[in-house]
Curated annotation (Swiss-Prot):
Classification via Gene3D superfamilies: 3.40.50.2020
Family: Belongs to the purine/pyrimidine phosphoribosyltransferase family. PyrR subfamily.
Protein name per the record: Bifunctional protein PyrR
Sections of the chain in a coiled coil: none
Keywords of this entry: Glycosyltransferase, RNA-binding, Transcription, Transcription regulation, Transcription termination, Transferase
Keyword Plastid: no
Enzymatic reactions: UMP + diphosphate = 5-phospho-alpha-D-ribose 1-diphosphate + uracil
EC number(s) stated in the UniProt entry for this protein: 2.4.2.9
UniProt short sequence motif PRPP-binding, positions renumbered to this chain: 99-111
Cysteines engaged in disulfide bonds, as pairs: none
Role: Regulates transcriptional attenuation of the pyrimidine nucleotide (pyr) operon by binding in a uridine-dependent manner to specific sites on pyr mRNA. This disrupts an antiterminator hairpin in the RNA and favors formation of a downstream transcription terminator, leading to a reduced expression of downstream genes. Also displays a weak uracil phosphoribosyltransferase activity which is not physiologically significant.
Oligomer status and interactors: Homodimer and homohexamer; in equilibrium.
Amino acid sequence: MEKQVQILDESGINRALTRIAHEILEKNKGSKDVILVGIKTRGVPLANRLAEKIKTIEGSEVAVGILDITLYRDDLTKEQLDPVVHGSDVKVDINEKTVILVDDVLYTGRTTRAALDALVDIGRPKVIQLAVLVDRGHRELPIRADYVGKNVPTSKEEIIKVQIKEIDGNNSVLLK
């Protein structure tokens, strides 16, 4: 039987996202010209939750976009060379805006690199920041998150599993 430990429960995730929302507002001096872009799959509902929290705190709407990085990944195996692409959906102009990429886990940095490539194909933001729910270390690329919900140092053999209610039916972060 596989041993797993719960790192964050629903209330822990909620507190982490509330703190990240406050940090985003503090660092950017409000929400003007801020756009949240969720990296498919679990980054999208996290970006939506951050937008709701920012609206509650600041009283203003923040645009949310969806980024599908499938075609930009450099770690696809030969079996995955024909990936199913669902498309990005960034309906607002990101030029000269502060774009915050949102993802569930930061590990090697390869997903973030692919997201950066996809984003610059859409436009030229003034600045790009990164918000992640969990940073587990083990970078292969020089990438650092601006906003981190929880740092969870892991071994390379361990797995962080983020469950999001909108996708998985419940909210938790597990270490396996």
